[in-house]
Curated annotation (Swiss-Prot):
The lineage of its organism: Bacteria, Bacillati, Actinomycetota, Actinomycetes, Mycobacteriales. Belongs to the universal ribosomal protein uS15 family. SUPFAM superfamilies: S15/NS1 RNA-binding domain (SSF47060). GO terms for biological process: translation. NCBIfam families: S15_bact. It comes from the Bacteria. InterPro entries: Ribosomal_uS15, Ribosomal_uS15_bac-type, uS15_NS1_RNA-bd_sf. Gene3D superfamilies: 6.10.250.3130, S15/NS1, RNA-binding. Coiled coil: none annotated. This is Small ribosomal subunit protein uS15. Keywords: Ribonucleoprotein, Ribosomal protein, RNA-binding, rRNA-binding. CDD domains: Ribosomal_S15p_S13e.
Amino acid sequence: MALTSEQKKEILSSYGLHATDTGSPEAQIALLTKRIADLTEHLKVHKHDHHSRRGLLLLVGRRRRLIKYLSLIDVQRYRSLIERLGLRR
């Protein structure tokens, strides 16, 4: 299920650089993390949904590239975000 606009606003307000921030790496990574978590729960129930599994792999790859970009431009912001989201690195 897609994220509702209320869920997006909540995530963006807590992870964005300002209230209307949608383009910073932190905001994008936080939104992707929520979508990945939702899709992972879906796949636990629907094990044979291979189309959604491919979508999940694409989202994980996109998040990985954004995380790598953030680590290259600002290591402190990268470490802070990884800790806040609870991702392993």
